[in-house]
Swiss-Prot record:
Residues 139-149 have a biased composition (Basic residues). InterPro entries: HHV-1_REF-bd, ICP27-like. Multifunctional regulator of the expression of viral genes that contributes to the shutoff of host protein synthesis and mediates nuclear export of viral intronless mRNAs. Early in infection, this immediate early (EI) protein mediates the inhibition of cellular splicing. This results in the accumulation of unprocessed 3'end pre-mRNAs which can't be exported from the nucleus. Cellular protein synthesis is thereby shut off early after virus infection. Residues 214-233 have a biased composition (Pro residues). Methylated within the RGG box possibly by host PRMT1. When hypomethylated, ICP27 is exported to the cytoplasm earlier and more rapidly. A motif (Nuclear export signal) lies at residues 5-17. This is mRNA export factor. Homodimer. Interacts with host RBP1; this interaction facilitates the RNA polymerase recruitment to viral transcription sites. Interacts (via the RGG box) with host ALYREF/THOC4; this interaction recruits ALYREF to viral replication compartments and probably directs viral mRNA to the TAP/NFX1 pathway. Interacts with host ALYREF2. Interacts (via the RGG box) with host SRPK1; this interaction relocalizes SRPK1 to the nucleus and seems to alter its activity. Interacts with ICP4; this interaction modulates ICP4 DNA-binding activity. Residues 16-26, 35-51 have a biased composition (Acidic residues). Residues 500-512 are annotated as: Important for homodimerization. The keyword Lyase does not apply. The modification Phosphoserine is found at residues 16, 18, 114. The lineage of its organism: Viruses, Duplodnaviria, Heunggongvirae, Peploviricota, Herviviricetes. Belongs to the HHV-1 ICP27 protein family.
Length: 512
């Protein structure tokens, strides 16, 4: 067995700071063991290496210069002999009494057992990273040294770490290291947390040894779920609620038959006609001495566009008078706006085109006279009705036409409302009407001229009244001849000439 000094060197103790300065000289055999253990600047070997001084490669030659076994005492306590502390013969167990607080062993702390991590069971040993490949041995016992005399997993780390090849006297110049310097982190077995947990020494400062980090807890590890058994039955899924008509609604629907009668339907038609006979409620527009008197009063019967035809010059001359009538009678203008909206949504294709030209020509007249475009105006305020009616009637045709021309779809044209999307008369009508309807819906006080693509100081010269009707009828006829689809030809023809030919098969009425 090794001597006390050999044991202290094995534990990394600086003998200059220990309490064994005044130990008596040891015999030559002890000095020889000391030379063998201190033959290199590295840490000494483990207890197993010390018990077997001759390794597999044969005995190591003894160096010529022998280090003295006893060093002089420190200058701060000259002449004070230190009591030699006997080395314990066995490692202390958990129930053994602790040494005296003034002894070297109390400062060093309990030694860790020289056991390999393979002896530790559980999941910690399995989670340890694979050991680093050791460097080839250089002969003698140096090739068999492991770490700091321990049989831990990093047996070769002591050879590759430059900090462990430093002289023992430079490791802790301020005195002996604390006893808990090489203890593992809390809850970690010996040797589990030492690999890769040391922090590098601060440059130019004293080396400190902190507490090692413990391995990660098992709760932080990604654990894959167990594979599902394909033979296991699938979990039951709740059936969605049935989408049915509730009983109360069914009773309401059937109760219509109890109230439906021919006399009741006739009375409903009579009351509606009486309301429409005087839609303004006795407060119509003042039409005395007005060139617009025939159209300001209510009229029965269908609308005939030819009887209301006016030239652009007439509109420029008498348009401001009608504009002032709308602006000076807000209640009558509100009633006229509601009635116009209902009429526009029931027009056929030719009448809808005439309404589009009416709206754009009215805007051109206002721009010509520098009049504000008012959303409360009955003509401008009902632009959305013109747009909806035209889109409903032309949608089946425009799906094929716009795609063949490489233009945006109808819905995209109306939602984007960009002047740059205007490429022909069809896109012009829908983009301009969509921009006007959007301003009215937003409730702006006035609509600027730029909404119609008119710059500052410009007039609406690019639009001629009647271009909507003439242009859209032209593209219907042109595309009908160019497109090879029979369905497209039938659709375009029925839009222009809509008399009934085929499609309605019966009329069923069990109530009256």
């Amino acid at each position: 067995m090794a001597t006390d000094i050999d044991m202290l060197i094995d534990l990394g103790l600086d003998l200059s700071d220990s309490d064994l300065d005044e130990d008596p000289p040891e015999p030559a055999e002890s000095r020889r063991d000391d030379l063998e253990s201190d033959s290199s600047g590295e840490c000494s070997s483990s207890d197993e290496d010390m018990e077997d001084p001759h390794g597999e490669d044969g005995p190591e030659p003894i160096l010529d210069a022998a280090r003295p076994a006893v060093r002089p005492s420190r200058p701060e306590d000259p002449g004070v002999p230190s009591t030699q502390t006997p080395r314990p013969t066995e490692r202390q167990g958990p129930n053994d009494p602790q040494p005296a607080p003034h002894s070297v062993w109390s400062r060093l702390g309990a030694r860790r057992p020289s056991c390999s991590p393979e002896q530790h069971g559980g999941k910690v040993a399995r989670l340890q990273p694979p050991p680093t490949k050791a460097q080839p041995a250089r002969g003698g016992r140096r090739g068999r040294r492991r770490g700091r005399g321990r049989g831990g997993p990093g047996a070769a780390d002591g050879l590759s770490d430059p900090r462990r090849r430093a002289p023992r006297t430079n490791r802790n110049p301020g005195g002996p290291r604390p006893g808990a310097g090489w203890t593992d982190g809390p809850g970690a077995p010996h040797g589990e947390a030492w690999r890769g947990s040391e922090q590098p020494d601060p440059p130019g400062g004293q080396r400190t040894r902190g507490v090692r980090q413990a391995p990660p807890p098992l709760m932080t590890l990604a654990i894959a779920p167990p594979p599902a058994d394909p033979r296991a039955p699938a979990p039951e899924r709740k059936a969605p609620a049935a989408d049915t008509i509730d009983a109360t609604t069914r009773l309401v629907l059937r109760s219509i038959s109890e109230r439906a009668a021919v006399d009741r339907i006739s009375e409903s038609f009579g009351r509606s006609a009486q309301v429409m006979h005087d839609p303004f409620g006795g407060q119509p527009f003042p039409a005395a001495n007005s060139p617009w008197a025939p159209v300001l009063a209510g009229q029965g019967g269908p609308f005939d566009a030819e009887t209301r035809r006016v030239s652009w010059e007439t509109l420029v001359a008498h348009g401001p008078s009608l504009y002032r009538t709308f602006a000076g009678n807000p209640r009558a203008a509100s009633t006229a706006k509601a009635m116009r909206d209902c009429v526009l949504r029931q027009e056929n294709f030719i009448e809808a085109l005439a309404s589009a030209d009416e709206t754009l020509a009215w805007c051109k007249m206002c721009i010509h006279h520098n009049l504000p475009l008012r959303p409360q105006d009955p003509i401008i305020g009902t632009t959305a009705a013109v747009l909806d009616n035209l889109a409903t009637r032309l949608r089946p045709f425009l799906q094929c036409y716009l795609k063949a021309r490489g233009l945006c779809g109808l819905d995209e044209l109306c939602s984007r409302r960009r002047l740059a999307d205007i490429k022909d008369i069809a896109s012009f009508v829908f983009v301009i009407l969509a921009r006007l309807a959007n301003r009215v819906e937003r409730g702006v006080a006035e609509i600027d001229y730029a909404t119609l693509g008119v710059g500052v100081g410009e007039k609406m010269h690019f639009y001629l009244p009647g271009a909507c009707m003439a242009g859209l009828i032209e593209i219907l006829d042109t595309h009908r001849q160019e497109c090879s689809s029979r369905v497209c030809e039938l659709t375009a023809s029925h839009i222009v000439a809509p008399p009934y030919v085929h499609g309605k098969y019966f009329y069923c009425n069990s109530l009256f």
